From Swiss-Prot:
It comes from the Eukaryota. This is pre-mRNA 3' end processing protein pfs-2. The keyword Lipid biosynthesis does not apply. It comes from Caenorhabditis elegans. One of its GO terms (cellular component) is mRNA cleavage and polyadenylation specificity factor complex. The C-terminus is required for the regulation of synapse and axon development. Keywords: mRNA processing, Nucleus, Repeat, WD repeat.
Length: 809
């Protein structure tokens, strides 16, 4: 019936055709085509595109492939080039910029035929090596460039991925070493020849179709297909080259004329010409007619054996490389040598023309070097002197011309690619980290988890100590180099109690939590022991006082232990140069308490009404620099003559804050003790040429007590006027006070801070200690020189030895 009527179980005339997906569209959805709207297509078969990509040795062998390694992705560049080619003409195309961000705009090699230098492959990508280490004699790419096939000494085929360069599969192809590999022009057959003289036929799926013996018990060194793929030629160590019929596996011609082994062979790309190279030094290169088997020409320019010959695709140029370290190019139209290329230091073993650029070729040497050449220049345009450790037996370009594979006698197969935008020619292995080079590769690399903070790093950050004259510790120096903000300004110099550095403490502490701090250096501990031993402060010294207004610790006998006075400034770590620690009370009880010292110091000048009360002492002077970091001390009970604490400028560095008021009884708990040490950043030196630092070269520790004590900085001479001032001290003028006469700059004796002067029995001891009361530190020797040393006891042990330990080292 016509129209819409149907008979019985007749199906409607609807053709649903499912287009099978090719290998390049494996993940795409199948297309459903409705052809019932077109009656003329009713009886036509649906055209199915063949799989032209050739999937190689089967998909079942790829289940262990993991594309997680670094690879060369040329698909995006090709797609961008095809898209931009539709609307860009000539000079409008995007230029490649020297940055990795422009990598996507890189164009394939065939899009720039006028710029062959873009295909100088000097960037190392990856090394491929079999589990069984053996020399690689031959390499060849699959026709579509998806895989690289290598033949090694063990007779195995190894397939490597052409994008990620990882291992895919391996199979035993021959019983002896594979010496040659060659694909047919129709890309359907692969020929392989081995050391035993056998030739095998292989299909693209690595199926062995046929095998025969071409040269009996002699190695086959080369293979060459005819342009029509009907015939092929072999070169052998028996001194002959033979022409074979591919379909019938029969020998057609034997080319005899060389007096030694024939090492290489190549067939002309369009004509019936065969070129062979031999170890015969008299007839190294010959041109043959495969139909008649006669020799057409002999090229004798090489003075040694020839290891490689290859025709250019234009059919006019012939390259030869020999053991004389030379590469020669001949024009076969004139049978004349055109150029000679000299750069190799050893024999030339392999040659390869670029598949896209006609005038570019590469040569491999016996020393593992790779050299890139242009036919119009005698000097190389690219050189990799140590690409391999040994001779390069074979090298092949990728069909697109952007990758070069080399097989060497050092058991390695290496891949070389073009430089990315921004890479330098010298950076062969991609080691440069400047700009954005290698940034994408670093993002893909796994990162190490930060180490867990130890007990030391979990504590509150304490500023590091700095000893003048000893230099910076290594970790502190490295820390400064990492922090550019601290190195660009002069206000961040590391000195004791530098408030600017305290402001940077949170910043530094955040970085130090991830750094394992090294132990204290031996030089630093040795310096502290020398300092404690040489200071020589024993019983009756300045550190052990019985001031009622003092701020020390009391022992069982009522004595007080005050902080030591040193010229290094108040230590930032709590007293010790190595770190804070608490003194042990039993160590202090062994020191006999001195007598109470009262009265003004000998060189103390007083200005204003006298102080009332014989037992009134002076608290430590206030800290300079204003109220930074909470260091300002609140004034104690009472006032200085009812006028408040004296204020004045000291060297132009802020206001002196504090009070010399009398204190009755113990101080309040909320008052924090501030050590009355010297801030040598603002105090003048004893001489014009002095820096005020510790001179380690002149320190003499453990000096015997006989005679005058040794001084590494001698006390200034005492004049007649100064002696009278010590007997009758004038009033203090805080506004115009010589820093050397400032009571804060003295060695810190408590008897110098008493307004009523020392008792007569102590004046004599003060006179005997002459040089010990100067404002610069002295070194004394004695049997009990380490007893009562507060700075050393806080470091731990008797005499300041060790860190929190009671016994010496």
């Amino acid at each position: 019936m016509n129209g819409g009527m149907m008979r019985g179980n007749q199906m409607p005339n609807v053709t649903l055709t499912i287009q099978p997906s090719t290998s390049s569209m494996q993940n795409s959805q199948p297309r459903i085509m409705n052809n019932h709207h077109h009656p003329h297509n009713r009886f036509q078969r649906e055209h199915v595109m063949p799989d032209v990509m050739g999937d190689g040795p089967g998909r079942r062998l790829r289940k262990n492939v993991a594309n997680v390694r670094r690879h060369v992705d040329y698909v995006s560049t090709v797609l961008n080039h095809c898209e931009n080619r539709l609307w860009q003409y000539g000079k409008q195309r995007i230029l490649q910029q020297p940055d990795i961000l422009y990598q996507q705009y890189a164009v394939p090699a065939d899009s720039t035929p006028d710029v062959p230098v873009d295909c100088i492959l000097t960037k190392f990508i990856r090394t491929a090596m079999n589990k069984v280490k053996c020399p690689v004699y031959s390499v060849c790419w699959s026709p579509e460039g998806k895989r690289l096939i290598t033949g090694c000494q063990t007779g195995e085929f190894t397939l490597w991925n052409g994008t990620a360069f990882n291992f895919e599969t391996i199979l035993q192809a021959h019983d002896s070493a594979i010496r040659a590999l060659k694909w047919a022009s129709n890309e359907q057959w692969l020929l392989s020849a081995d050391q035993g003289g056998y030739v095998k036929y292989w299909q693209p799926n690595m199926n062995n179709a046929h095998m025969f013996s071409a040269h009996k018990d002699e190695a086959i060194r080369g293979l060459a297909f005819a342009p029509t793929d009907v015939k092929f030629a072999t070169a052998s160590d028996d001194g002959t080259a033979r022409v074979w019929d591919f379909a019938r596996y029969t020998e057609e011609r034997v080319l005899r004329g060389h007096g030694a082994e024939v090492r290489c062979i190549d067939w002309h790309p369009t004509k019936g010409l065969i070129a062979t190279g031999s170890r015969d030094t008299q007839q190294p290169v010959k041109i043959w007619d495969p139909k008649s088997g006669s020799c057409l020409a002999t090229l004798q320019e090489h003075k040694s054996s020839v290891m490689a010959v290859e025709f250019n695709k234009n059919g006019n140029w012939l390259l030869t490389g020999g053991r004389d370290h030379l590469v020669k190019m001949y024009d076969i139209r004139m049978m004349k040598e055109m150029r000679t290329y000299r750069a190799h230091k050893k024999e030339v073993i392999s040659l390869a023309w670029h598949p896209i650029h006609e005038g570019l070729f590469v040569s491999g040497g016996g020393d593992g070097s790779i050299v890139y050449w242009m036919v119009d220049g005698e000097k190389e345009i690219g050189l990799l002197e140590h690409a391999h450790d040994q001779a390069i037996w074979s090298m092949k370009w990728h069909p697109l011309g952007h990758i070069l594979a080399t097989g060497s006698n050092d058991n390695n197969t290496k891949f070389w690619a073009r430089n990315r935008p921004g890479d330098t020619v010298e950076d062969i292995f991609g080691l440069s980290n400047t700009n954005m080079i290698g940034h994408l590769d670093k993002e893909r690399e796994p990162r190490m988890a930060p180490p867990k903070p130890s007990i030391e790093t979990q504590e509150t950050y304490r500023p590091d100590t700095f000893i003048p004259g000893m230099g910076l510790d290594e970790h502190l120096y490295e820390q400064l180099n990492r922090d550019h903000n601290m190195m660009t300004t002069d206000s961040t110099l590391l000195v004791p109690d530098d408030l600017t550095r305290q402001n940077f403490a949170p910043m530094i502490g955040a970085k130090r939590t991830l750094i394992k701090q090294p132990p204290a250096k031996k030089a630093q501990r040795q310096f502290e022991r020398m300092w404690n031993n040489s200071k020589g402060i024993g019983a009756g010294s300045d550190d052990f006082t019985t001031m009622k207004g003092g701020l020390g610790r009391e022992d069982a006998e009522g004595a007080q232990f005050g902080p030591s006075k040193s010229f290094l400034g108040p230590p930032t770590t709590g007293g010790s140069l190595l770190g804070p620690s608490q003194p042990r009370p039993q160590e202090f009880r062994s020191v006999p308490p001195p007598q109470q010292q009262q009265g003004p110091p000998p060189n103390w000048r007083h200005q204003g009404p006298p102080m009332s009360g014989p037992g009134q002492g002076y608290g430590p002077p206030g800290r300079m620099g204003g109220n930074q970091g909470g260091w300002q001390r609140p004034p104690p009970q009472g006032s200085y003559g009812g006028q408040g604490p004296p204020q004045g400028s000291y060297g132009g560095q802020g206001t002196l804050q504090g009070s010399y008021a009398s204190q009755q009884g113990p101080p309040p708990r909320q008052i924090q003790h501030i050590p009355s040490d010297i801030d040598y950043r603002t105090a003048p030196s004893s001489s014009n040429g002095s820096t005020g630092d510790v001179d380690m070269r002149t320190m003499v520790p453990n000096q015997p007590p006989s005679g005058e004590p040794e001084h590494w900085r001698g006390p200034p001479p005492v004049s007649h006027q100064q002696q009278s001032q010590q007997q009758h001290p004038p009033p203090i003028n805080m506004q115009r006070m010589d820093p050397r006469r400032d009571p804060r700059m003295l060695s810190g004796r408590s008897d110098q801070l008493s307004p009523s002067g020392p008792p007569p029995q102590q004046q004599q001891s003060s006179a005997q200690q002459g040089g010990k009361n100067q404002w610069m530190p002295q070194f004394e020797a004695g049997q009990n020189q380490n007893q009562g040393n507060y700075a050393g006891n806080r470091g731990g042990g008797v005499g300041g030895r060790g860190r929190g330990r009671g016994q010496p080292y």
